[in-house]
């Protein structure tokens, strides 16, 4: 135990380790807050669809040789979130079908672009890093940490300020509309916010694993709590703890950051499921 603490203390002296912890915790917090709403609205896989769009946007940025791809990826992902929301309201194309269509199409086209216009000698490595997150935590820069911090504060502020409206839209959208709540506006706000979170999480866990950050903490919290506020708080705490623990384990074991965080999330879900079966906390 002493050796582990000494090793962690040694690593803590390096800025990139602190950057990874800060970014991981912030992304986990934002993902969990939105995850509860998305799971309850049965729109969990919007994260999966938009993450593949973000992957496609990164492929376009690579083809155009854009060094700072964040603005382009952010714009394309937000536009796709808006279009996905509008398409999901179409009676001819249901929400799940629209997400599946967008997800598979974006993934196929982006990989095709990366093959046809490859600007890297290590295409498979680039694709793996984008899909599953960076295998090294050395990739985070100070500017990325600050950008993540600012956007994370904005996401949390939106959720806190609009909590009552989001709660109403989540549980009974028709009733919310009947009492004058602009449900479409808040659905749009949720879609844009999740798009921002997905772009932020790309470097940490990769496009294929982002949905895990959104879904697992929410499902784990729902196993032990029934109250919306309690579920939201529990999901946030669980997500932050799992992210921090996953990053620390990846540092000590030398494993990929994103995959390790998701593995810890899965373990937490199994524990919460066990507590639920034993008749644990239900408030």
Regions found by a protein language model. Give the residues of each.
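Transmembrane alpha-helical segments in multi-pass inner-membrane proteins
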Residues: 203-259
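Cytosolic-side transmembrane-helix boundaries in multi-pass membrane proteins
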Residues: 255-262, 266-283
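Structural signature of hydrophobic alpha-helical transmembrane segments
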Residues: 16-28, 67-78, 149, 199-212, ...
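Membrane-interfacial amphipathic/re-entrant helices at transmembrane-helix boundaries
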Residues: 1-29, 283
């Amino acid at each position: 135990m002493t050796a582990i603490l000494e090793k962690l203390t040694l690593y803590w002296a390096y800025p990139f380790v602190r950057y990874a912890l800060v970014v991981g915790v912030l992304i986990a917090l934002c993902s969990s807050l939105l995850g509860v709403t998305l799971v309850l609205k049965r729109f969990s896989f919007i994260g999966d669809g938009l993450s593949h769009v973000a992957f496609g946007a990164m492929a376009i940025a690579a083809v155009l040789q854009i060094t700072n791809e964040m603005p382009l990826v952010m714009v394309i992902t937000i536009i796709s979130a808006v279009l996905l929301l509008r398409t999901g309201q179409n009676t001819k194309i249901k929400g799940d079908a629209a997400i599946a269509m967008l997800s598979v199409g974006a993934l196929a086209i982006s990989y095709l672009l990366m093959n046809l216009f490859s600007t890297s000698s290590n295409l498979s490595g680039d694709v793996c890093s984008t899909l599953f997150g960076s295998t090294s935590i050395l990739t985070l820069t100070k500017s990325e940490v600050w950008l993540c911090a600012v956007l994370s504060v904005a996401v949390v502020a939106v959720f806190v300020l609009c909590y009552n409206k989001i709660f109403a839209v989540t549980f009974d959208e028709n009733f919310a509309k009947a009492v004058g709540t602009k449900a479409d506006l808040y659905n749009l706000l949720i879609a844009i916010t999740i798009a921002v979170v997905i772009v932020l999480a790309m470097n940490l866990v990769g496009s294929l694993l982002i949905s895990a950050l959104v879904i697992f903490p929410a499902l784990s919290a729902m196993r032990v709590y029934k109250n919306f506020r309690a579920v939201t708080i529990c999901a946030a705490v669980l997500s932050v703890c799992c992210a921090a623990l996953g990053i620390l384990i990846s540092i000590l074991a030398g494993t990929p950051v994103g995959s390790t965080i998701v593995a810890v999330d899965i373990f937490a879900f199994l524990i919460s499921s066990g507590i639920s079966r034993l008749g644990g906390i239900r408030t």
